[in-house]
UniProtKB/Swiss-Prot annotation:
It comes from Macaca fascicularis. Signal peptide: none annotated. InterPro entries: Gpn (IPR004130), Gpn2 (IPR030231), P-loop_NTPase (IPR027417). This is GPN-loop GTPase 2. The record marks N78 as: Stabilizes the phosphate intermediate. Belongs to the GPN-loop GTPase family. CDD domains: GPN2. Small GTPase required for proper localization of RNA polymerase II and III (RNAPII and RNAPIII). May act at an RNAP assembly step prior to nuclear import.
Amino acid sequence: MAGAAPTTAFGQAVIGPPGSGKTTYCLGMSEFLRALGRRVAVVNLDPANEGLPYECAVDVGELVGLGDVMDALRLGPNGGLLYCMEYLEANLDWLRAKLDPLRGHYFLFDCPGQVELCTHHGALRSIFSQMAQWDLRLTAVHLVDSHYCTDPAKFISVLCTSLATMLHVELPHINLLSKMDLIEHYGKLAFNLDYYTEVLDLSYLLDHLASDPFFRHYRQLNEKLVQLIEDYSLVSFIPLNIQDKESIQRVLQAVDKANGYCFGAQEQRSLEAMMSAAMGADFHFSSTLGIQEKYLAPSNQSVEQEAMQL
Protein backbone atom coordinates (compact mmCIF):
# COMPACT_ATOMS: atom_id res chain seq x y z
CA MET A 1 0.00 0.00 0.00
CA ALA A 2 1.04 3.62 -0.44
CA GLY A 3 2.98 4.90 2.55
CA ALA A 4 0.71 7.63 3.91
CA ALA A 5 -2.59 6.08 2.84
CA PRO A 6 -4.91 4.71 5.53
CA THR A 7 -4.61 0.95 5.90
CA THR A 8 -8.30 0.24 6.45
CA ALA A 9 -10.91 0.97 3.78
CA PHE A 10 -14.69 0.73 4.03
CA GLY A 11 -17.46 0.15 1.54
CA GLN A 12 -20.64 -1.56 0.43
CA ALA A 13 -21.15 -4.65 -1.70
CA VAL A 14 -24.45 -3.91 -3.46
CA ILE A 15 -26.19 -7.17 -4.33
CA GLY A 16 -29.69 -8.27 -5.30
CA PRO A 17 -31.70 -9.78 -8.16
CA PRO A 18 -31.86 -8.14 -11.61
CA GLY A 19 -34.05 -5.05 -11.68
CA SER A 20 -33.93 -4.43 -7.94
CA GLY A 21 -32.20 -1.07 -8.43
CA LYS A 22 -28.54 -1.80 -7.64
CA THR A 23 -27.02 0.56 -10.21
CA THR A 24 -29.50 3.32 -9.34
CA TYR A 25 -28.66 2.77 -5.67
CA CYS A 26 -24.94 3.14 -6.38
CA LEU A 27 -25.60 6.40 -8.22
CA GLY A 28 -27.84 7.84 -5.49
CA MET A 29 -25.66 6.67 -2.60
CA SER A 30 -22.46 7.97 -4.24
CA GLU A 31 -24.02 11.42 -4.70
CA PHE A 32 -25.24 11.43 -1.10
CA LEU A 33 -21.83 10.38 0.25
CA ARG A 34 -20.02 13.05 -1.76
CA ALA A 35 -22.42 15.64 -0.35
CA LEU A 36 -21.33 14.48 3.12
CA GLY A 37 -17.70 15.03 2.17
CA ARG A 38 -16.62 11.44 1.67
CA ARG A 39 -14.40 10.51 -1.24
CA VAL A 40 -16.24 7.79 -3.14
CA ALA A 41 -15.06 5.21 -5.66
CA VAL A 42 -17.73 3.19 -7.47
CA VAL A 43 -16.50 -0.20 -8.71
CA ASN A 44 -18.51 -2.04 -11.36
CA LEU A 45 -18.18 -5.80 -10.86
CA ASP A 46 -20.96 -6.63 -13.33
CA PRO A 47 -19.56 -7.32 -16.82
CA ALA A 48 -23.12 -7.13 -18.20
CA ASN A 49 -23.54 -3.50 -17.07
CA GLU A 50 -23.58 -1.09 -20.00
CA GLY A 51 -24.18 2.64 -20.12
CA LEU A 52 -23.36 3.18 -16.45
CA PRO A 53 -24.98 6.36 -15.06
CA TYR A 54 -22.21 6.96 -12.52
CA GLU A 55 -18.51 7.75 -12.83
CA CYS A 56 -16.81 4.36 -12.64
CA ALA A 57 -13.43 4.22 -10.85
CA VAL A 58 -12.88 0.55 -11.72
CA ASP A 59 -14.74 -1.48 -14.34
CA VAL A 60 -14.43 -5.26 -14.52
CA GLY A 61 -15.24 -4.94 -18.23
CA GLU A 62 -11.64 -3.84 -18.72
CA LEU A 63 -10.54 -7.31 -17.55
CA VAL A 64 -13.17 -9.54 -19.12
CA GLY A 65 -16.17 -8.83 -21.35
CA LEU A 66 -19.38 -10.82 -21.17
CA GLY A 67 -19.99 -10.63 -24.92
CA ASP A 68 -16.51 -11.91 -25.72
CA VAL A 69 -16.92 -14.81 -23.28
CA MET A 70 -20.31 -15.78 -24.71
CA ASP A 71 -18.96 -15.73 -28.27
CA ALA A 72 -15.70 -17.55 -27.54
CA LEU A 73 -17.11 -20.26 -25.26
CA ARG A 74 -20.64 -20.45 -26.71
CA LEU A 75 -22.23 -19.75 -23.34
CA GLY A 76 -25.55 -18.13 -22.53
CA PRO A 77 -25.84 -14.93 -20.47
CA ASN A 78 -25.95 -16.73 -17.10
CA GLY A 79 -23.15 -19.17 -17.88
CA GLY A 80 -21.06 -16.40 -19.39
CA LEU A 81 -21.45 -14.21 -16.34
CA LEU A 82 -20.50 -17.05 -13.99
CA TYR A 83 -17.37 -17.61 -16.09
CA CYS A 84 -16.55 -13.89 -15.89
CA MET A 85 -16.76 -13.95 -12.09
CA GLU A 86 -14.60 -17.06 -11.92
CA TYR A 87 -12.11 -15.32 -14.20
CA LEU A 88 -12.08 -12.30 -11.90
CA GLU A 89 -11.59 -14.62 -8.92
CA ALA A 90 -8.56 -16.12 -10.66
CA ASN A 91 -7.14 -12.66 -11.46
CA LEU A 92 -7.59 -10.78 -8.20
CA ASP A 93 -4.13 -9.25 -8.59
CA TRP A 94 -5.66 -7.11 -11.35
CA LEU A 95 -8.42 -5.93 -9.00
CA ARG A 96 -6.01 -5.19 -6.17
CA ALA A 97 -3.79 -3.16 -8.47
CA LYS A 98 -6.84 -1.08 -9.41
CA LEU A 99 -8.03 -0.61 -5.81
CA ASP A 100 -4.70 0.16 -4.13
CA PRO A 101 -4.38 3.71 -5.55
CA LEU A 102 -7.91 4.42 -4.26
CA ARG A 103 -7.10 3.83 -0.58
CA GLY A 104 -8.79 6.54 1.45
CA HIS A 105 -11.94 6.31 -0.68
CA TYR A 106 -15.25 4.80 0.36
CA PHE A 107 -16.04 1.94 -2.03
CA LEU A 108 -19.36 1.02 -3.64
CA PHE A 109 -19.22 -2.33 -5.46
CA ASP A 110 -21.99 -2.73 -8.04
CA CYS A 111 -22.33 -6.52 -8.20
CA PRO A 112 -23.98 -8.82 -10.79
CA GLY A 113 -27.65 -9.66 -10.32
CA GLN A 114 -27.53 -13.44 -10.80
CA VAL A 115 -29.03 -14.85 -7.62
CA GLU A 116 -26.90 -18.01 -7.66
CA LEU A 117 -23.75 -15.91 -7.16
CA CYS A 118 -25.05 -14.92 -3.73
CA THR A 119 -26.77 -18.14 -2.69
CA HIS A 120 -24.48 -21.04 -3.63
CA HIS A 121 -21.79 -20.18 -6.21
CA GLY A 122 -18.42 -19.56 -4.58
CA ALA A 123 -16.76 -16.94 -6.80
CA LEU A 124 -18.28 -13.76 -5.37
CA ARG A 125 -17.90 -14.96 -1.77
CA SER A 126 -14.25 -15.76 -2.46
CA ILE A 127 -13.70 -12.28 -3.91
CA PHE A 128 -15.25 -10.64 -0.83
CA SER A 129 -13.18 -12.87 1.44
CA GLN A 130 -10.00 -11.81 -0.31
CA MET A 131 -10.97 -8.15 0.01
CA ALA A 132 -11.21 -8.67 3.76
CA GLN A 133 -7.60 -9.88 3.66
CA TRP A 134 -6.75 -6.53 2.04
CA ASP A 135 -8.29 -4.82 5.10
CA LEU A 136 -11.35 -3.71 3.17
CA ARG A 137 -14.38 -3.77 5.46
CA LEU A 138 -17.55 -4.31 3.46
CA THR A 139 -21.23 -4.45 4.30
CA ALA A 140 -23.43 -6.47 1.96
CA VAL A 141 -26.41 -4.33 0.94
CA HIS A 142 -29.07 -6.66 -0.44
CA LEU A 143 -31.82 -4.93 -2.44
CA VAL A 144 -35.24 -6.49 -2.92
CA ASP A 145 -38.14 -4.95 -4.84
CA SER A 146 -40.66 -3.75 -2.25
CA HIS A 147 -43.70 -4.65 -4.37
CA TYR A 148 -43.07 -8.34 -3.54
CA CYS A 149 -44.64 -7.55 -0.17
CA THR A 150 -48.02 -7.35 -1.89
CA ASP A 151 -47.84 -11.07 -2.80
CA PRO A 152 -47.51 -13.37 0.26
CA ALA A 153 -46.05 -16.26 -1.76
CA LYS A 154 -43.42 -14.04 -3.37
CA PHE A 155 -42.59 -12.50 0.00
CA ILE A 156 -41.87 -15.95 1.47
CA SER A 157 -39.62 -16.59 -1.53
CA VAL A 158 -37.86 -13.27 -0.92
CA LEU A 159 -37.32 -14.20 2.73
CA CYS A 160 -35.77 -17.54 1.74
CA THR A 161 -33.48 -15.88 -0.81
CA SER A 162 -32.44 -13.19 1.67
CA LEU A 163 -31.67 -15.78 4.34
CA ALA A 164 -29.66 -17.93 1.92
CA THR A 165 -27.72 -14.85 0.80
CA MET A 166 -26.94 -13.80 4.37
CA LEU A 167 -25.61 -17.25 5.21
CA HIS A 168 -23.59 -17.64 2.01
CA VAL A 169 -21.96 -14.24 1.47
CA GLU A 170 -20.50 -14.11 5.00
CA LEU A 171 -20.43 -10.31 5.36
CA PRO A 172 -22.18 -7.88 7.71
CA HIS A 173 -25.55 -7.66 6.02
CA ILE A 174 -28.34 -5.13 5.44
CA ASN A 175 -31.55 -6.03 3.57
CA LEU A 176 -33.40 -3.20 1.82
CA LEU A 177 -36.91 -2.96 0.41
CA SER A 178 -36.16 -0.78 -2.60
CA LYS A 179 -38.52 1.42 -4.65
CA MET A 180 -40.73 2.21 -1.66
CA ASP A 181 -42.54 4.84 -3.70
CA LEU A 182 -43.87 1.98 -5.90
CA ILE A 183 -44.67 -0.52 -3.14
CA GLU A 184 -48.41 -0.64 -3.86
CA HIS A 185 -48.07 -0.37 -7.63
CA TYR A 186 -49.17 -4.00 -8.06
CA GLY A 187 -51.58 -4.32 -5.14
CA LYS A 188 -52.37 -3.47 -1.53
CA LEU A 189 -50.46 -4.75 1.48
CA ALA A 190 -52.32 -7.27 3.63
CA PHE A 191 -50.63 -5.98 6.80
CA ASN A 192 -48.93 -2.86 8.11
CA LEU A 193 -45.47 -2.10 6.75
CA ASP A 194 -43.69 -3.03 9.98
CA TYR A 195 -44.99 -6.58 9.60
CA TYR A 196 -42.80 -6.92 6.50
CA THR A 197 -39.77 -4.90 7.62
CA GLU A 198 -39.46 -6.66 10.99
CA VAL A 199 -40.67 -10.05 9.64
CA LEU A 200 -43.19 -10.54 12.42
CA ASP A 201 -45.23 -13.69 13.15
CA LEU A 202 -45.37 -15.35 9.73
CA SER A 203 -48.27 -17.62 10.71
CA TYR A 204 -50.56 -14.74 9.71
CA LEU A 205 -49.02 -14.88 6.25
CA LEU A 206 -49.78 -18.61 6.07
CA ASP A 207 -53.39 -17.96 7.01
CA HIS A 208 -53.58 -15.34 4.28
CA LEU A 209 -52.15 -17.80 1.75
CA ALA A 210 -54.68 -20.44 2.81
CA SER A 211 -57.44 -18.29 1.33
CA ASP A 212 -55.95 -18.89 -2.12
CA PRO A 213 -57.17 -22.20 -3.64
CA PHE A 214 -53.84 -22.74 -5.41
CA PHE A 215 -51.55 -22.20 -2.41
CA ARG A 216 -53.87 -24.11 -0.08
CA HIS A 217 -52.38 -27.31 -1.50
CA TYR A 218 -48.86 -26.16 -0.56
CA ARG A 219 -49.59 -25.18 3.04
CA GLN A 220 -47.25 -27.80 4.52
CA LEU A 221 -44.39 -26.67 2.27
CA ASN A 222 -44.95 -23.04 3.20
CA GLU A 223 -45.12 -23.96 6.89
CA LYS A 224 -41.70 -25.62 6.66
CA LEU A 225 -40.21 -22.63 4.84
CA VAL A 226 -41.65 -20.23 7.41
CA GLN A 227 -40.34 -22.40 10.24
CA LEU A 228 -36.86 -22.31 8.71
CA ILE A 229 -36.95 -18.52 8.39
CA GLU A 230 -38.16 -18.06 11.97
CA ASP A 231 -35.66 -20.56 13.38
CA TYR A 232 -32.77 -18.47 12.08
CA SER A 233 -34.51 -15.18 12.96
CA LEU A 234 -31.96 -13.19 10.93
CA VAL A 235 -33.94 -11.46 8.20
CA SER A 236 -35.31 -7.94 8.51
CA PHE A 237 -35.61 -5.05 6.06
CA ILE A 238 -35.05 -1.31 5.91
CA PRO A 239 -37.37 0.60 3.53
CA LEU A 240 -35.60 2.66 0.87
CA ASN A 241 -36.62 5.31 -1.61
CA ILE A 242 -33.38 6.34 -3.30
CA GLN A 243 -34.92 9.73 -4.19
CA ASP A 244 -35.51 10.53 -0.49
CA LYS A 245 -32.46 11.84 1.40
CA GLU A 246 -33.88 10.88 4.80
CA SER A 247 -34.37 7.33 3.53
CA ILE A 248 -30.77 7.18 2.26
CA GLN A 249 -29.52 8.52 5.58
CA ARG A 250 -31.28 5.75 7.51
CA VAL A 251 -29.68 3.15 5.27
CA LEU A 252 -26.22 4.73 5.55
CA GLN A 253 -26.42 4.80 9.35
CA ALA A 254 -27.21 1.08 9.39
CA VAL A 255 -24.42 0.30 6.93
CA ASP A 256 -21.86 2.36 8.85
CA LYS A 257 -22.75 0.62 12.07
CA ALA A 258 -22.49 -2.81 10.41
CA ASN A 259 -18.97 -2.35 9.01
CA GLY A 260 -17.65 -0.16 11.83
CA TYR A 261 -17.17 3.00 9.79
CA CYS A 262 -19.00 5.24 12.25
CA PHE A 263 -16.50 4.25 14.94
CA GLY A 264 -13.40 4.81 12.79
CA ALA A 265 -10.87 7.56 13.34
CA GLN A 266 -10.45 8.62 9.70
CA GLU A 267 -12.87 11.53 9.79
CA GLN A 268 -12.12 12.58 13.42
CA ARG A 269 -15.80 12.76 14.28
CA SER A 270 -16.97 14.48 17.41
CA LEU A 271 -18.48 12.31 20.14
CA GLU A 272 -21.91 13.75 19.42
CA ALA A 273 -21.72 12.76 15.75
CA MET A 274 -20.51 9.29 16.63
CA MET A 275 -23.39 8.71 19.03
CA SER A 276 -25.84 9.97 16.45
CA ALA A 277 -24.51 7.51 13.85
CA ALA A 278 -24.32 4.61 16.29
CA MET A 279 -27.78 4.99 17.75
CA GLY A 280 -29.52 6.18 14.62
CA ALA A 281 -29.08 2.82 12.92
CA ASP A 282 -31.59 1.27 15.30
CA PHE A 283 -34.50 3.63 14.91
CA HIS A 284 -35.89 2.40 11.59
CA PHE A 285 -38.61 0.47 13.42
CA SER A 286 -39.94 3.62 15.09
CA SER A 287 -39.85 5.48 11.78
CA THR A 288 -41.77 2.79 9.89
CA LEU A 289 -45.13 4.36 10.69
CA GLY A 290 -44.04 7.63 9.10
CA ILE A 291 -42.80 5.77 6.02
CA GLN A 292 -46.10 3.91 5.77
CA GLU A 293 -48.07 7.16 5.92
CA LYS A 294 -45.81 8.64 3.24
CA TYR A 295 -45.90 5.86 0.65
CA LEU A 296 -48.98 3.73 1.35
CA ALA A 297 -52.49 4.84 0.52
CA PRO A 298 -54.78 5.03 3.58
CA SER A 299 -57.43 2.32 3.73
CA ASN A 300 -59.75 0.61 6.15
CA GLN A 301 -58.21 -2.13 8.25
CA SER A 302 -58.41 -5.61 6.81
CA VAL A 303 -59.38 -8.67 8.79
CA GLU A 304 -55.71 -9.66 8.92
CA GLN A 305 -54.66 -6.29 10.34
CA GLU A 306 -57.35 -6.44 13.02
CA ALA A 307 -56.18 -9.92 13.99
CA MET A 308 -52.60 -8.68 14.29
CA GLN A 309 -53.68 -6.09 16.87
CA LEU A 310 -55.49 -8.60 19.12
